[in-house]
Amino acid sequence: MARHEFQTEVNQLLNLLIHSLYSNKDIFLREIVSNASDALDKLKYLTVSDDNYKNISFTPKIDISFDDKDNVLVVQDSGIGMNDEDLQNNLGTIARSGTKAFLEKLSSDAAKDSSLIGQFGVGFYSAFMAAKHIDVITKKAGSDGKIWHWSSDGTNSYDLEEIGADSDLTKKYGFDDSALTGSAIVMKLNDESKEYASRWKIEELIKRYSDHIAFPIYLHYDQNKYDDKGNVTSTEKKVDQVNSASALWKRPKSELKKEDYNEFYKTIGHDGEEPLHYVHTHAEGTQEYTTLFFVPQRAPYDMYQADYQSGVKLYVKRVFITDDDRELLPAYLRFVRGVIDSEDLPLNVSREILQQNRILETIKSASVKKLLGEFKKMGEAADSAKKAENPTDEDKAKIEKWNKFVANFNRPMKEGLYSDYANRDEIAEIVRFKSTDSSGTGDNNWTSFADYVQRMKTDQKAIYYISGNDEKNLRENPLLKAYIDKGFEVLIMADDIDDIVIPGFGKYKDFELKAVNRAGSDEELGVDKKEAEKKDKEFKPVVEKIKKALGDAVKDVVLSKRLSAESPSCIVVDENDPGFQMERMMKAMGQEGMGVKPILEVNGDHSLVNRIKQTDDEALIKDVSEVLLNQALLIAGVEIKEPAEFVKHLNNLLA
């Protein structure tokens, strides 16, 4: 028997599971049964799609047995099974790039963290919450027939060995039958978990969490017979099927309760929480298919990772095809969990065929429109509830539901504005933004484009926004005051993708979107042109002095027509240049920046600017110019290149 060390991250996870996360220990059985179902799905698919597997003997089922004297619980499936390489990859390591971040996210808050465990796809390890030792006996279908024994107590290492057809373990779990494949998970329960070696506890958990599993789950138990005095006279071996074994999504919606959907979601979503929303659709006609989609309460841990795991499973006539195809829904809907089941796709469809299949493309298109329609209705229901004079509990629930959606999924929905041209009008009704409007239409002044337009001034020609990396900084930007004073509402866009998405989106209905921190966005402020020309002429020497002092640090210096008296300067970006957010994103991705240079606007009514007007002292002009630029950069949330130099110039002015 060879001993192997667990990957460091597995050790950390097991330590958390065993010592910290006890809030909902019951989920371990749900996770083990779900894994067994996945193993059956995979083999079932191979038996209909791969000639090498079509003639194997395959009876899909899950068997659960227990020993209440030795406190042992066994879950065995007749699925795909594993070889030694699979065991090392699946049960010895966590091959995910986000492992470290996930473990950092886990905390001592057990109620919260239990849902994260399954999200990360480490359901097997959750068994160590109840078991002090686990043995896995397994044989892989279509392989060399070798039987493997994996064993661990969850501390630091595991043992792995090949066992013969004549070994006791092989015979005990039936793997001496050459036709039998699959895995047996043998859990020696710890002292605090003896209740799981009980017929009634197992049956209760299967009915609660796994009734919808599409394969039969059989519970093996001993039933005693008693005489009149209560003495055991005989014991009979019994086997009962304890789940309904029907694909929940294929059942009529009228037969299903909210609880049925919730428990199904917890299994396929590996989540301890109920879904935020679900939508169940049966489509008939040219194509026949069923979709059942769920929106989680919280964003999946890997939503912003390049190797995020797709949350949608594809079935054909209830035969599992794949759960690893990101083409089933567009990337901006990667937080959606659920099932697509087609009656028309071929069973032996390959990954390459899927990517070009018209049937699947039609299903995808209809599914996206259905989901977007549901999201829009959620938002409208919440907005309507917010306007109620005396909101009911139902109104409050609608508002809370929508606020959760916005808090978790507003950013990926914005990605859709940029990437999904066909549906951008629908997405534009869903996305929300912070705003300078004091009434707002949601908590913390979230608003929609539609509500912004309703509040616009009568002759207003554009939707105004300001973008940057920090909401607080943006709200304090001196540019805002000019627009607010003139009665213009400004959207606050502090997401790192806003500088990419919004210019690409461009217009909402007939209204152009204009960034107030870009040049050329001040035409509606009602500036007196004659007065502006007079002032430009008066301050032209001042502007030239500042340009000379700053050199290549700026693209241009102009006299501002919108700053209030207390603000000496601000920076804007040229209409045709990428924003500072784009620059920041590129550098964060290890790419060379585009060298965006700001345009410095200076306020001729401010005393600091007038100090330059009154002097030809080049040192003083340099000090004032550097302070005007760098304080404007700081207020805009842009990193200054030489902080020490800035402080030196500031001190010179204060001396």
List where the protein language model places each region:
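GHKL (Bergerat-fold) ATPase N-terminal catalytic module, capturing the glycine-rich phosphate-binding loop
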Residues: M1-D191, E195-Y196, K457
